[in-house]
Amino acid sequence: RRAHTLHRAARVVRERHGGRIPGDPEALRRLPGVGRYTAGAIASIAFGLPEPAVDGNVRRVLSRLHDLPDPGAAELRRLAAELVPAERPGDFNQALMELGATVCTPRSPRCDRCPIASYCRARAAGTQAERPRPKPSKAIPEDDVGTAIVLAPDGALLLVRRPEDGLLGGLWEFPGEVVAAGEMP
């Protein structure tokens, strides 16, 4: 799916932007598959614009820095935007992402190696291991599926294409259906 989306975005860049990736964060966000994080990362790293790039690592760093148990996306973007400097914003965003990936890790944060530990409210409160509060796990659905393997006399197999907008969108599979509880396939 990412490859399809990337291809669609490349087509839009070619057709609407003369083959040049737009530098405006809002124009970037209008590209297929480009959300706030990707637009902020591209704008700051490639174009030097002071835009926040909040990924999971940055979320964790900011949650701990401000000792926030469950910050919302808008609050995190606001906090990140306040920190991003006008000079070298891409380097700053990359450093914050790297800090979250290597030092301020989800489990066993290495506060003794953190360059911003003296500013960290969660460390001061002893709550760094609890920040941000983990999201509850999603229940994984379990379905029984009846599948048919249809072989033609010439050895060809019957395959059907999955819907574009679902799980494994656009890929091919043997024909089948979810079987209701108690039914035989």
Per-region residue spans from a language model:
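Intrinsically disordered, low-complexity, charged terminal extensions of DNA damage-control enzymes
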Residues: E98-P185
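Catalytic cores of DNA base-excision repair glycosylases
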Residues: R1-E130, E183
